[in-house]
Amino acid sequence: MTYYNVGKIVNTQGLQGELRVLSVTDFADERFKKKSVLALFDDKDNYIMDVEVASHRKHKNFDIVKFKGLYHINDVEKYKGCSLKIAEENLTDLDDGEFYYHEIIGLDVYEGNTLIGQVKEILQPGANDVWVVKRKGKKDLLLPYIPPVVLDVDVAAGRIEVELMEGLDDED
């Protein structure tokens, strides 16, 4: 079975079994909603068990999550440092123009017929995502995911078409 990372448990929160999660998904409200089923993996990426979300709330930059059956700090403390993942079969369909990170990472980025590089990471610094494009012989390119820059994403073809605005590529 294929799993996709949605967050990392960084600490406990209080005494009632809540966990502080650093989310790595654009869909935190969907992923951590009550009754959602997630998989727990240890720091060596070994599957531990499935967990069902009992409650979720936001606190500062974290998602605070509580799992069904784990209602005390002693039940959850051992999961600090573990990852939360979603099974591929539990992914929901997205609207046109929306993509899961795993669909974007690894795609080739082109400007016209010129290969620029490959998306290696997605950052979330603020208003829009920033795609980190690994290039040969040059430093990584930070590409904002905005309409004037990203013209087309064809996941099936493994290709992203962009138009680099002036100032985006400081190596030119």
Curated annotation (Swiss-Prot):
Q: GO CC terms on record?
A: cytoplasm; ribosome
What's the superkingdom here? Bacteria
Gene Ontology molecular function: any one: ribosome binding
**What broad class describes the main subcellular location of this protein?**
cytoplasm
> Which parts of the sequence belong to the PRC barrel domain?
96-168
Extract the PANTHER family matched here: RIBOSOME MATURATION FACTOR RIMM
Q: Give the UniProt family note.
A: Belongs to the RimM family.
The written remark on domains in the entry is: The PRC barrel domain binds ribosomal protein uS19.
Supply the NCBIfam families for this chain.
Answer: 16S_RimM (TIGR02273)
Spell out the subunit comment: Binds ribosomal protein uS19.
What is the protein's name according to its record? Answer: Ribosome maturation factor RimM
Q: Which organism is it from?
A: Streptococcus thermophilus (strain ATCC BAA-250 / LMG 18311)
